[in-house]
Amino acid sequence: MRFMAGESKQGIRAGAVVMASAAAVAATVWGVATLVEPGKAATQQNVSRSTDPAGGAGSQPQGIPEGIAHGSEAGENAVNITIDDGPDPRWTPKVLEVLQRHDVKATFCMVGPQAKAHPGLVKKVVAAGHRLCDHTMDHDTAMDKKSVAYQERQILDAKELIEEAAGSGAKVEYYRAPGGAFTPDSRRIAAAHGMRPLGWNVDTKDFGKPGTAAVVDAVKREIGNGPTVLFHDGGGNRAQTVDALDQVLDWLKEQGRPTGFPVRTTP
Ligand SMILES: [Zn+2]
């Protein structure tokens, strides 16, 4: 989950694996908790400054619910493939190639400055029929502890950069908080700007490079948690991710599981 931005890239490399592991554990807990009780954790953390006392039961005028999406538009049996922390000039093209080979559409959760730095990749993602998701400006996994104004800038500045990079009027359709650090406010801001808050149910833990087999096994073991699977195309060497994604897509086909996009307008 840890996104290493520009100037700090070298200084924190040694600690990145440990931090990524901790984030992955937290993320899994978060995903399962959310599956059982949607929105509860975020409501407890942020109730004092929430402007939405219903804790996400609301829906914005354009019909985008504030609640975190876990379902698939492609039906109950479908799986949503989501790809985080890119785009990355080395690994995003490899991920795109695997998806194309399997004729699978995925949702790419991009970090604003990465999109700005690699607009050609954003355009490729859109041209291949995938969907865009806002993964903030700085991938601050503690943003849920910060001001609403800060959260708003993290979300809306990234949306602007991603859409500028995409061009052709392409829209960012989802918002995923880094490390699952959603708040009622951030969900409201996202929904008000046409972006459905998007969670995950299966963390493949690919970020920590546990080996291709471990990444594949995580999907097989945890797909019963829910339909949305988390992979990464950013944050370092993603060779295991590319291989594991290829195997997972073979396995899903064998299992008769279609793939699709996360729900946007249904609760
Ligand atoms: Zn991330």
Which residue ranges define each predicted feature?
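N-terminal pre-catalytic segment of deacetylase/amide-hydrolase enzymes
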Residues: R2-I81, D88-R101, K123, Q247-P267
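A general, composition-driven signal for non-globular sequence regions
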Residues: F3-E7, A24, G129, C133, ...
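Compositionally biased, intrinsically disordered low-complexity segments enriched
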Residues: N46-V47, T136-M137, G234
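Active-site beta->alpha N-cap acidic-glycine motif
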Residues: D52-Y150, Q154-D157, L161, V172
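Catalytic domains of cell-wall/extracellular-matrix polysaccharide-remodeling enzymes
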Residues: K94, K116-A117, H139-R257, V263-P267
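Hydrophobic alpha-helical membrane segments, chiefly transmembrane helices and signal peptide h-regions
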Residues: V18-A33, R131, L198, I223, ...
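Generic signal for short, ordered secondary-structure residues
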Residues: G11, N77-A78, V104, G169, ...
